[in-house]
Amino acid sequence: RIRYFSALIFLLLFTSNIFAKKNPNIVYIMSDELAYFELSHMGNKYIKTPNIDQFAAEGIRFTSALAGAPVCAPLRCNLMTGKHAGHASIRANDGGTPLRENETTIASMLKQIGYETGGFGKWGCGGRDSTGVPEKHGFDLFYGYYDQVHAHSFYPSYLIQNSVEVELKGNKGGRTGQTYSHYKIMEAGLNFIRKKKDKPF
């Protein structure tokens, strides 16, 4: 009986210690068409990426993995859902196939354990009025491009925040304009992190 009682006390102390710890913040970076050695921590002598290098030094690097698909939208679906390409809802890069309704994503799983979730940049898993928009798959906030074809312009006339168009002043959707979209996306991401600094994100 003493042995079982001691084991029970240990278990209670162990589990209370787990729940007392704060969940770590997660910054998940995905980049299209980035070669393995283009980052300076991988040995590139010409391109300097000190902030990403710091993430690599202090965080987790996945170095033994294969891409689930060779093109944008299917790969994004694989990474968001954790599914093999043969089971994923998005298998082509046509920009029209969305995530299925109620599809589990990394964001929806993190929401279940108390995380604030934000996505910034290119989504590629479903356009507005589809089952695949980010806010239907666990994201509190998404700001950027829903459609990867829309992302082919650095100066689009608008970006999207939770299915609502946000106008970018001085842009007509061409190769030049007044508002560089990536600066706006970066600002939105940094603002999200600053506002959520006291909660796990």
Regions found by a protein language model. Give the residues of each.
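Bacterial Sec-dependent N-terminal signal peptides
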Residues: 1-22
